[in-house]
Amino acid sequence: MADKLWVGGDGTGSQQTDWSRAANWSPSGVPVASDTVTFQSSSTYSVTAGLDQSSVSLGAMRIEAGYSGSIGTSSTPLECDPASLVVDTGDVGANLFFDFGAQTLDVTIKSCSFGSLGTYGVELSGAGVAISTLIVDSGKVGICTGVNETATVTTARVSGSAGELHLGTGVTLTNVDQSAGTIVVACSISDIDISGGVLTTDQAAAVTTSATVHGGTLNLDGSGTVASLVVHGGTVNFRGGVARTVTALTLNQGSISYDPASVTVTTWNVADRPVTVSATT
Protein backbone atom coordinates (compact mmCIF):
# COMPACT_ATOMS: atom_id res chain seq x y z
CA MET A 1 0.00 0.00 0.00
CA ALA A 2 1.50 3.32 -1.12
CA ASP A 3 0.52 6.88 -1.98
CA LYS A 4 0.84 7.55 -5.70
CA LEU A 5 0.80 11.06 -7.17
CA TRP A 6 0.04 11.51 -10.88
CA VAL A 7 2.78 13.56 -12.52
CA GLY A 8 2.60 12.75 -16.23
CA GLY A 9 4.87 14.22 -18.85
CA ASP A 10 7.41 11.42 -19.17
CA GLY A 11 8.51 10.50 -22.68
CA THR A 12 6.91 11.92 -25.81
CA GLY A 13 3.43 12.11 -27.31
CA SER A 14 0.88 9.77 -25.78
CA GLN A 15 3.51 8.39 -23.39
CA GLN A 16 3.16 11.60 -21.37
CA THR A 17 -0.49 10.84 -20.60
CA ASP A 18 -0.19 7.06 -20.14
CA TRP A 19 -1.37 5.68 -16.77
CA SER A 20 0.71 2.54 -17.38
CA ARG A 21 4.04 4.39 -17.67
CA ALA A 22 5.95 4.07 -14.39
CA ALA A 23 7.74 7.42 -14.62
CA ASN A 24 4.42 9.26 -14.87
CA TRP A 25 3.94 8.57 -11.16
CA SER A 26 5.65 9.78 -8.01
CA PRO A 27 7.20 7.78 -6.54
CA SER A 28 7.93 5.96 -9.79
CA GLY A 29 5.78 2.92 -10.45
CA VAL A 30 2.28 2.23 -11.73
CA PRO A 31 -0.30 2.01 -8.90
CA VAL A 32 -1.03 -1.47 -7.62
CA ALA A 33 -3.68 -2.95 -5.33
CA SER A 34 -4.64 -0.81 -2.31
CA ASP A 35 -2.55 2.19 -3.43
CA THR A 36 -4.04 5.65 -2.88
CA VAL A 37 -4.05 7.65 -6.13
CA THR A 38 -4.04 11.46 -6.11
CA PHE A 39 -4.27 14.05 -8.87
CA GLN A 40 -3.06 17.52 -7.81
CA SER A 41 -2.65 20.97 -9.33
CA SER A 42 1.08 20.29 -9.69
CA SER A 43 0.29 18.22 -12.80
CA THR A 44 -1.39 19.61 -15.91
CA TYR A 45 -1.24 16.32 -17.81
CA SER A 46 -4.41 14.44 -18.69
CA VAL A 47 -4.79 10.64 -18.62
CA THR A 48 -5.61 9.41 -22.12
CA ALA A 49 -3.75 6.09 -22.45
CA GLY A 50 -3.35 2.93 -20.38
CA LEU A 51 -7.00 3.33 -19.40
CA ASP A 52 -7.81 -0.34 -18.68
CA GLN A 53 -6.87 -0.69 -15.01
CA SER A 54 -9.90 -2.83 -14.19
CA SER A 55 -7.80 -5.63 -12.71
CA VAL A 56 -6.36 -3.37 -9.98
CA SER A 57 -8.34 -2.84 -6.76
CA LEU A 58 -7.09 0.59 -5.74
CA GLY A 59 -7.48 2.31 -2.40
CA ALA A 60 -8.87 5.83 -2.38
CA MET A 61 -8.79 8.02 -5.50
CA ARG A 62 -8.66 11.80 -5.03
CA ILE A 63 -8.92 14.46 -7.73
CA GLU A 64 -7.92 17.62 -5.90
CA ALA A 65 -8.43 21.37 -6.34
CA GLY A 66 -6.49 22.85 -9.23
CA TYR A 67 -6.10 19.67 -11.30
CA SER A 68 -7.24 20.78 -14.76
CA GLY A 69 -6.48 17.70 -16.84
CA SER A 70 -9.06 15.32 -18.28
CA ILE A 71 -9.31 11.63 -17.45
CA GLY A 72 -10.53 9.26 -20.15
CA THR A 73 -13.21 10.12 -22.68
CA SER A 74 -16.93 9.41 -22.98
CA SER A 75 -16.22 6.51 -25.36
CA THR A 76 -13.08 5.28 -23.55
CA PRO A 77 -13.32 5.98 -19.81
CA LEU A 78 -10.72 5.08 -17.22
CA GLU A 79 -11.58 1.55 -16.07
CA CYS A 80 -10.59 1.18 -12.44
CA ASP A 81 -11.81 -0.16 -9.10
CA PRO A 82 -11.10 2.33 -6.30
CA ALA A 83 -12.48 1.90 -2.80
CA SER A 84 -13.69 5.51 -2.89
CA LEU A 85 -13.65 8.56 -5.15
CA VAL A 86 -13.43 12.20 -4.04
CA VAL A 87 -13.43 14.99 -6.65
CA ASP A 88 -12.79 18.62 -5.75
CA THR A 89 -11.40 20.22 -8.92
CA GLY A 90 -13.70 23.23 -9.01
CA ASP A 91 -15.14 24.45 -12.29
CA VAL A 92 -11.63 24.73 -13.79
CA GLY A 93 -11.37 20.97 -14.12
CA ALA A 94 -11.83 19.17 -17.43
CA ASN A 95 -14.19 16.24 -17.94
CA LEU A 96 -13.55 13.08 -15.91
CA PHE A 97 -14.86 9.75 -17.23
CA PHE A 98 -14.77 6.56 -15.15
CA ASP A 99 -15.99 2.99 -15.65
CA PHE A 100 -16.11 1.28 -12.26
CA GLY A 101 -17.32 -2.10 -13.52
CA ALA A 102 -19.01 -3.91 -10.63
CA GLN A 103 -17.02 -2.16 -7.90
CA THR A 104 -18.57 -1.12 -4.56
CA LEU A 105 -17.56 2.36 -3.38
CA ASP A 106 -18.58 5.75 -1.99
CA VAL A 107 -18.46 8.78 -4.29
CA THR A 108 -18.14 12.39 -3.10
CA ILE A 109 -18.17 15.23 -5.63
CA LYS A 110 -17.29 18.35 -3.67
CA SER A 111 -16.83 20.31 -6.89
CA CYS A 112 -16.28 19.61 -10.58
CA SER A 113 -16.86 21.30 -13.92
CA PHE A 114 -20.27 21.61 -15.53
CA GLY A 115 -19.06 20.10 -18.82
CA SER A 116 -20.05 21.28 -22.25
CA LEU A 117 -23.53 20.92 -23.73
CA GLY A 118 -24.69 17.32 -23.32
CA THR A 119 -21.73 16.27 -21.18
CA TYR A 120 -20.90 16.06 -17.49
CA GLY A 121 -17.98 17.26 -15.44
CA VAL A 122 -17.85 13.77 -13.92
CA GLU A 123 -19.42 10.82 -15.71
CA LEU A 124 -19.54 7.44 -13.97
CA SER A 125 -20.49 4.25 -15.78
CA GLY A 126 -20.33 0.57 -14.96
CA ALA A 127 -21.93 -2.84 -15.21
CA GLY A 128 -23.40 -3.34 -11.78
CA VAL A 129 -21.33 -0.73 -9.96
CA ALA A 130 -22.62 -0.31 -6.40
CA ILE A 131 -22.42 3.19 -4.91
CA SER A 132 -23.27 3.17 -1.22
CA THR A 133 -23.32 6.95 -0.74
CA LEU A 134 -23.25 9.48 -3.58
CA ILE A 135 -22.79 13.14 -2.59
CA VAL A 136 -22.83 16.04 -5.05
CA ASP A 137 -22.16 19.57 -3.78
CA SER A 138 -21.14 21.44 -6.94
CA GLY A 139 -20.79 20.60 -10.62
CA LYS A 140 -22.63 18.41 -13.12
CA VAL A 141 -22.50 14.65 -12.55
CA GLY A 142 -23.91 11.79 -14.62
CA ILE A 143 -24.42 8.25 -13.33
CA CYS A 144 -24.91 5.50 -15.93
CA THR A 145 -26.65 7.77 -18.42
CA GLY A 146 -25.57 5.68 -21.43
CA VAL A 147 -27.01 2.55 -23.01
CA ASN A 148 -26.54 -0.78 -21.18
CA GLU A 149 -24.97 0.86 -18.14
CA THR A 150 -26.16 -0.30 -14.72
CA ALA A 151 -25.62 0.76 -11.13
CA THR A 152 -27.17 0.58 -7.71
CA VAL A 153 -27.13 3.71 -5.58
CA THR A 154 -28.20 3.33 -1.96
CA THR A 155 -28.28 7.03 -1.05
CA ALA A 156 -27.92 10.02 -3.38
CA ARG A 157 -27.55 13.40 -1.68
CA VAL A 158 -27.40 16.87 -3.27
CA SER A 159 -26.92 19.70 -0.77
CA GLY A 160 -25.21 22.49 -2.75
CA SER A 161 -27.08 25.00 -4.89
CA ALA A 162 -24.58 24.44 -7.72
CA GLY A 163 -24.89 20.65 -7.60
CA GLU A 164 -26.50 18.91 -10.58
CA LEU A 165 -27.03 15.14 -10.67
CA HIS A 166 -28.40 13.04 -13.54
CA LEU A 167 -29.20 9.33 -13.11
CA GLY A 168 -29.93 7.07 -16.09
CA THR A 169 -32.53 4.37 -16.64
CA GLY A 170 -30.11 1.60 -15.65
CA VAL A 171 -29.74 2.84 -12.08
CA THR A 172 -31.46 1.18 -9.14
CA LEU A 173 -31.92 4.02 -6.66
CA THR A 174 -33.05 3.57 -3.07
CA ASN A 175 -32.92 6.94 -1.28
CA VAL A 176 -32.73 10.55 -2.47
CA ASP A 177 -32.02 13.30 0.06
CA GLN A 178 -32.06 16.76 -1.51
CA SER A 179 -31.79 20.18 0.13
CA ALA A 180 -30.56 22.23 -2.85
CA GLY A 181 -29.41 21.97 -6.45
CA THR A 182 -30.87 19.96 -9.32
CA ILE A 183 -31.58 16.25 -9.76
CA VAL A 184 -32.94 14.58 -12.91
CA VAL A 185 -33.88 10.93 -12.49
CA ALA A 186 -34.79 8.56 -15.34
CA CYS A 187 -34.92 5.51 -13.06
CA SER A 188 -37.35 4.46 -10.37
CA ILE A 189 -36.74 5.57 -6.78
CA SER A 190 -37.77 3.96 -3.53
CA ASP A 191 -37.79 7.03 -1.23
CA ILE A 192 -37.51 10.77 -1.90
CA ASP A 193 -36.99 13.40 0.80
CA ILE A 194 -36.71 16.92 -0.62
CA SER A 195 -36.46 20.19 1.31
CA GLY A 196 -34.95 22.43 -1.38
CA GLY A 197 -33.79 22.55 -4.98
CA VAL A 198 -35.54 20.95 -7.96
CA LEU A 199 -35.99 17.22 -8.51
CA THR A 200 -37.48 15.95 -11.77
CA THR A 201 -38.45 12.37 -12.58
CA ASP A 202 -38.37 11.44 -16.26
CA GLN A 203 -39.27 8.65 -18.69
CA ALA A 204 -40.81 5.67 -16.83
CA ALA A 205 -39.51 6.65 -13.38
CA ALA A 206 -41.72 5.59 -10.47
CA VAL A 207 -41.64 6.27 -6.74
CA THR A 208 -42.07 2.83 -5.26
CA THR A 209 -42.34 3.66 -1.54
CA SER A 210 -42.79 7.37 -0.77
CA ALA A 211 -41.98 10.93 -1.76
CA THR A 212 -41.92 13.45 1.10
CA VAL A 213 -41.74 17.13 0.19
CA HIS A 214 -40.76 19.72 2.82
CA GLY A 215 -39.70 22.43 0.38
CA GLY A 216 -38.25 22.98 -3.06
CA THR A 217 -39.89 21.71 -6.24
CA LEU A 218 -40.72 18.12 -7.18
CA ASN A 219 -41.64 17.60 -10.85
CA LEU A 220 -43.18 14.15 -11.24
CA ASP A 221 -42.91 13.88 -15.03
CA GLY A 222 -42.18 10.15 -15.14
CA SER A 223 -44.95 7.76 -16.16
CA GLY A 224 -44.43 5.39 -13.23
CA THR A 225 -46.76 5.11 -10.25
CA VAL A 226 -46.13 7.18 -7.12
CA ALA A 227 -46.95 4.89 -4.20
CA SER A 228 -47.20 7.65 -1.58
CA LEU A 229 -46.87 11.43 -1.84
CA VAL A 230 -46.77 13.50 1.36
CA VAL A 231 -46.46 17.27 0.95
CA HIS A 232 -45.48 19.38 3.97
CA GLY A 233 -44.38 22.37 1.88
CA GLY A 234 -42.84 23.35 -1.43
CA THR A 235 -44.33 22.67 -4.85
CA VAL A 236 -45.28 19.47 -6.65
CA ASN A 237 -45.94 19.52 -10.39
CA PHE A 238 -47.29 16.78 -12.64
CA ARG A 239 -46.27 18.17 -16.01
CA GLY A 240 -47.21 16.92 -19.46
CA GLY A 241 -50.07 14.70 -20.53
CA VAL A 242 -48.58 11.30 -19.71
CA ALA A 243 -50.92 9.08 -17.70
CA ARG A 244 -49.78 8.27 -14.17
CA THR A 245 -51.19 7.25 -10.80
CA VAL A 246 -50.66 8.43 -7.23
CA THR A 247 -51.79 5.67 -4.91
CA ALA A 248 -51.97 7.82 -1.75
CA LEU A 249 -51.69 11.61 -1.48
CA THR A 250 -51.47 13.75 1.67
CA LEU A 251 -51.37 17.54 1.34
CA ASN A 252 -50.53 19.24 4.64
CA GLN A 253 -49.02 22.41 3.24
CA GLY A 254 -47.52 23.64 -0.02
CA SER A 255 -49.06 23.29 -3.48
CA ILE A 256 -49.79 20.64 -6.09
CA SER A 257 -50.44 21.20 -9.79
CA TYR A 258 -51.93 18.36 -11.84
CA ASP A 259 -54.45 17.58 -14.57
CA PRO A 260 -57.02 14.96 -13.48
CA ALA A 261 -57.34 13.95 -17.13
CA SER A 262 -53.89 12.39 -16.93
CA VAL A 263 -53.18 11.99 -13.20
CA THR A 264 -55.23 9.58 -11.10
CA VAL A 265 -55.17 9.98 -7.32
CA THR A 266 -56.46 6.76 -5.78
CA THR A 267 -56.71 7.98 -2.16
CA TRP A 268 -56.63 11.52 -0.74
CA ASN A 269 -55.58 11.15 2.88
CA VAL A 270 -56.78 13.50 5.61
CA ALA A 271 -54.30 16.32 6.24
CA ASP A 272 -52.79 16.80 9.70
CA ARG A 273 -53.87 20.48 9.79
CA PRO A 274 -56.47 22.75 8.17
CA VAL A 275 -55.67 23.32 4.48
CA THR A 276 -57.01 25.44 1.65
CA VAL A 277 -57.24 23.81 -1.78
CA SER A 278 -57.80 25.94 -4.88
CA ALA A 279 -58.21 25.02 -8.53
CA THR A 280 -57.26 27.06 -11.60
CA THR A 281 -57.50 26.44 -15.31
Please place each PLM-identified region on the residue numbering.
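Extracellular beta-sheet-rich ligand-binding/adhesion modules
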Residues: 1-281
